[in-house]
Design a protein with these regions (language model features):
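Predominantly soluble domains enriched in secretory-pathway, periplasmic, or organellar proteins
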Residues: 1-108
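N-terminal pro-sequences and low-complexity stem/linker regions of secreted or lumenal proteins
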Residues: 80-424
């Protein structure tokens, strides 16, 4: 930690190279540094789809080698300034200058200063899986999409498409991650640790993302939820950064119920044939992350494609209704609904529809509750790895649903990433 006042800073300067430098060698004969950059210039390798469309994917990294003459002091100072600019570290100074807000200022949805009051009291972060912008929204005429790549367009995802008739369409939103192993870090920590990033593509410490138990897979600055907890804000975590302890069915058996069992249970519950879910206490989960364990809903499923998202929503809904009635809806709720990933028992189209319905139901319940006027719902993918996009493999759907998320024009093409959403 070079920011610590207790540690002498051994860094004399910084040299700009490629993305994710993983090794360096000094050529003493030529007085040069040779730096191997794991991700180099990023995922700019393109290929043509079966439809003849040039497209990109998150796995097409272009590694590079930087050959850098050993700089003198003046050149090193210039290089250091370039690194500072490349990494936008000047923005960190802007954040510091935005602190010191006035708690007595007039509340607005997004305060200009940290510490100013906000009209938003309840934040819901819905995490989904693996889709590019074009895969889901390529058929939306208002945005920069390619309809030929919209394999899960409006026919499979009518609810998220309907959202865009009222709320903003972001057609220039990106997930920095390659896949789940670093995607969950980007969402919850606003960065993937160096120890995680240079493992690409193996990720022996953190894959599959929410299942990591190694502290080296986490940023030392903490998580979105640990910061909320440190600020004394109530929060609940549904599925993120957790692992299963065991399954235990009502008859005492410890095998996992089938997808059909969970689905039938949800149908009966939603139709009023059951007052509670038969399998609601089947799952017991835990987390090795203390900030998660203290706020974890322990009967909510983790990443498991053998469980429909309707069951997840029904579990959350029971909890949400109790909180609404008691006036205890948390400030921050994280919900991981992942059937959009595909790979479970149903067909891919059915899994997309299951997830789309789940997202629609969550928004429907929140928007018809007494906390809607003070709520903001953020929806994003952990990564965009399982598809292609005609702009960039990292371009992904991102949604903000709130009384304060006003649609202005056909699309917002401002460059945003998961970091912007986490920061907001």
């Amino acid at each position: 930690d070079l920011t610590s006042a207790a540690v002498a800073n051994p860094v004399k300067g910084m040299i700009p190279v490629g993305y994710a430098p993983s090794s360096v060698v000094l050529d003493q004969v030529k007085n040069e540094l040779l730096v191997a950059n794991d991700k180099g210039i990023g995922t700019r390798y393109s290929f043509e789809t079966d439809y003849g469309v040039t497209s990109y994917n998150t796995h097409q990294d272009n590694g590079t080698v930087s050959i850098v003459p050993i700089p003198d002091s003046a050149t090193l100072q210039t290089m250091t300034s370039q690194v500072w600019e490349n990494n936008h570290w000047d923005l960190a100074q802007n954040i510091k200058s935005a602190s010191g807000g006035n708690p007595h200022a007039k509340p607005v949805a997004l305060p200009n200063k940290i510490g100013d009051p906000s009209l938003i009291k309840h934040v819901f972060l819905i995490i989904r899986e693996n889709r590019t912008y074009d895969q889901i929204l390529g058929d939306v005429a208002a945005g920069n999409g390619d309809p030929s790549l919209a394999v899960f367009g409006g026919k499979d995802t009518p609810n998220v498409h309907a959202l865009l008739k009222r709320f903003p369409l972001f057609d220039n939103f990106y997930d920095p991650s390659r896949q789940s192993a670093d995607g969950h870090q980007w969402i919850t920590e606003a960065m993937a640790p160096y120890a995680d990033d240079i493992q690409s593509p193996d990720w022996v410490r953190s894959y599959p993302g929410g299942n990591a138990g190694d502290a080296l897979a986490y940023q030392n600055k903490g998580f979105l939820f640990s910061e909320a907890a440190a600020a004394g804000l109530p929060l609940k975590i549904y599925g993120e950064y957790v692992e299963y302890d065991t399954f235990k069915q009502p008859d005492g058996t410890t095998t996992e119920p089938s997808w059909s069992d969970f689905y039938t249970d949800s149908k009966h519950f939603e139709a009023g044939l059951e007052k509670t879910l038969k399998y609601q206490n089947t799952i017991r989960a835990h987390s090795s992350v203390p900030a998660v364990y203290l706020h974890l809903i322990k009967n909510f499923p983790i990443f498991d494609l053998g469980i429909p998202d309707q069951f997840r929503v029904d579990l959350w809904l029971q909890d949400f209704r109790k909180d609404v009635a008691a006036g205890t809806v948390p400030t921050l709720s994280l919900l991981w609904v992942m059937d959009v990933h595909t790979g479970g028992p149903p067909t891919p189209d059915a899994e997309q529809a299951d997830n789309d319905l789940a997202v629609g139901r969550i928004i429907d319940y929140i928007s018809h509750s007494n906390v809607w006027s003070t709520s903001a719902i953020f929806i994003e993918e952990d990564d965009a790895q399982n598809g292609v996009d005609h702009v960039d493999g990292h371009r992904s759907p991102g949604y903000i649903v709130s009384p304060y998320a006003v649609q202005q024009g056909p699309a917002d093409s401002t460059y945003y990433t998961q970091v912007n959403m986490t920061r907001t």
